[in-house]
């Protein structure tokens, strides 16, 4: 073989990367025109409140940052790839009126450590367990979005006695049963190493919000963009979190997740195929689906009041059903 020439597979990868870069140029220009380089940004979000001092838990050598707010039954909120505790700002304060809300920076983002090497959803579920132990919480309901939904499933499988109820938002069942990521997002992930950080963020913002929100409420996109720029994530950590989600595969164990489960899915999600909600519901023995028509991947940014109502109503109904004595 001529060592001066690139192998065939490398040439093909290069061509695909160039096509992926071309595929995202037009959406980037479109979003850039919508947001504008001088668009005013107001960081005050509906439902936002002052946070208490950050607490620190440890899972072995890894330090994890988290917050506690509110009183009531414990409710853990777990974010997805590239988003820290700040991602719950539209809903955390509202939820804290009814629950003791725990928000966490996953490993690889925010004030938590960014250890080198591979991450896994099981590893990150153990991080959540370490936070519960540090906070003195024996049992909690768990809300997980995207990668956070996979982490929540792992937590329920590994430590079922610590999980009361589950709310899984815009997530997947994992493994071969998962429906593939929409093509545009696949192109974005392929092109990400060739893009500037700001360009990648602009495209991510466009893909994580529904088209109706982008068209009618561009301020939501501006706020989200501002928060992402204010809380950058190391590229290596973004890749490690992304890989953890791609490798998530419960291998048929989900039948063991018997906790009452609400699956929440936006019908205009461009990151997770909305059909995954039905697949996941078919695998969990005690699950139901609630759809947000026209909402995207970050549906709790687009419809915060409705999201809080859905979570609150579900937890109240599940608690009421559990309190009804069964007849022999």
Give the ranges of each region predicted by the language model.
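Alpha/beta-hydrolase fold catalytic core
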Residues: 4-75, 97-99, 137, 313-328
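Conserved HGGG/HGGXW glycine-rich cap/lid loop of the alpha/beta-hydrolase fold
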Residues: 60-114
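Active-site loop/oxyanion-hole signature of alpha/beta-hydrolase fold enzymes
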Residues: 107-143, 309
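Flexible "cap/lid" loop of the alpha/beta hydrolase fold
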Residues: 157, 164-194
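Conserved alpha/beta-hydrolase catalytic His-Asp/Glu region
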Residues: 177, 198-253
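Short beta-strand/loop motif that positions the catalytic acidic residue
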Residues: 257, 263-265, 269
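Conserved alpha/beta-hydrolase "acid-adjacent" motif
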Residues: 270-276
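Catalytic active-site module of serine/aspartate enzymes centered on a nucleophile-bearing elbow/loop
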Residues: 287-328
